[in-house]
Design a protein with these regions (language model features):
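A short glycine-rich, Lys/Arg-flanked "PGG" loop and its adjoining helix->strand segment in the class I
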Residues: 129-135
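Conserved SAM-binding loop of SAM-dependent methyltransferases across substrates and taxa
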Residues: 55-67
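Redox-cofactor binding/interface segments in oxidoreductases and associated redox assembly factors
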Residues: 119-121
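Short beta-strand element of Class I
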Residues: 68-72
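Conserved S-adenosyl-L-methionine
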Residues: 52
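Class I SAM-dependent transferase core
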Residues: 1-44, 49, 83-86
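S-adenosyl-L-methionine
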Residues: 74-117, 126
């Protein structure tokens, strides 16, 4: 399930400690991630949009629940998108979590797959929520 065999021992239960993620200090903390994943209720084969993904911790946790779950993270800051990509590479299966560099104030990026769930990690606006609901 993971590229790094050392991360296999972490299991699939959401709530990985922050030490397992590349991040700049701005990360959804592990208790919040565990509760968010319980509310999102990932099922095999489902897709998550993680908007304002930052380190990608919610998307990573989503993907780790089942090897057929996928996620797309959208992040405007290149440094945070790079951290999310590193976390995708180290903590999920290849191709399971994709990160798109995009500023959500310009709307949703083109070509996103239809989501089964959406997590807005930062910058939630009425317009963004409306755009998500319209999909």
């Amino acid at each position: 399930m993971t590229i790094d065999p050392d991360t296999a021992k972490l299991g699939r239960t959401p709530g990985l400690d922050e030490e397992h993620f590349a991040h700049d200090g701005l990360i959804t903390k592990h208790p919040v991630r565990a509760v968010a994943l319980a509310a999102l209720r990932p099922m095999p084969g489902q897709t998550l949009w993680d908007l304002g993904t930052g380190a990608g911790s919610v998307a990573v946790e989503w993907c780790r629940t089942d090897p057929t779950c996928t996620a797309v993270g959208v992040e405007r800051r290149a440094d945070r998108a790079a951290n999310a990509r590193a976390n995708a590479e180290n903590l999920t299966a290849p191709g399971q979590f994709t990160v798109i560099d995009h500023d959500l104030t310009e709307g949703l990026p083109d070509g996103l797959p239809t989501p089964d769930a959406v997590f807005i990690g930062g910058g939630a606006t009425a317009e963004l929520v409306g755009a998500c609901l319209a999909r």
